[in-house]
């Protein structure tokens, strides 16, 4: 069979934080090849698939991935050789079966995902299709609105800002190319605004600035100033989004932010006040990943106004998403390939979300590589939204540039999601 898997290679490479990660090559009988690299997160949900690290303190402070690489070569490869790469479900289910654990802890989600993605790329190459077309068919023509993380706080930066990500969202653009330009211009202007205030410093893991600010509101005020100074209208042309990452400042049933301890209802009221004051269209992880009842209350209060995204809450896991659907907790899901650990399961989760009117936001991780799979995934699934960081750091920009190429390839068929990719407030 020409599209059968002939060989698989894996190696230890570095991610954008200088930490080891897994890269895999899948070679088919017909000579087609797929190459994939897996990312890793800093702020990770407790229910994510297991990222296998060596634990050898003498190498990379214990963060090496040679065990995962060895698992690809010695356990995965012998079981996948001769399997048709066009049968993604079979490839993935075979690896999950070999692993045998509930969270991919035996082989490692990083080993399984690297092979899963490389297989899909090899299969796409074998039939002469770009990955987005292979995944989504002829209807894959929707370019996502980017949620651009331009001010970093929380676990992504060494500063005193509680909220992890402050994002700009170019909802009013007419094309992805225009959206990217708007974002880049606001980001460049933001540099000047911070410099004028004596706040310009380094950037965080995802390329956003990480200034020491007096409050979370100050970050929002600075973003509004940058949007206006760049010549755009806040809300109408460029909106705002937050990743609160509330699990990171949750302790004993309460939330510690702004230097004080607050109840879940106080945090909900605080987020509601921000939505009233600023053109915020999306809030991610507004509450702790196990604070389900508070999530229901948050959704009742804000779900008709803004997008409420579950990241740590859902961890790209279909069973957790189903619980959220049943409870009416949140209205959107963040999709991170390495949270669940295979392409097939990721696509199943996106399908479950779509069937239940939950939106999907395709996302990078804070520890990234030059792999651009998520750009193709966003277009292939018609997700309408992507999170892939700021407008600097090449591992972030690589995804934006891939989307520019896809838009060019699609030509007149390309449609930019803009406000249709987002929640109720942006459509009102």
Swiss-Prot record:
EC number: 4.2.1.11
Record's protein name: Enolase
Family: Belongs to the enolase family.
Gene: eno
Binding site for Mg(2+): 243, 284, 311
Cysteine disulfide partners in this protein: none
SUPFAM superfamilies per UniProt: Enolase C-terminal domain-like, Enolase N-terminal domain-like
The protein's annotated pathway: Carbohydrate degradation; glycolysis; pyruvate from D-glyceraldehyde 3-phosphate: step 4/5
Known role: Catalyzes the reversible conversion of 2-phosphoglycerate (2-PG) into phosphoenolpyruvate (PEP). It is essential for the degradation of carbohydrates via glycolysis.
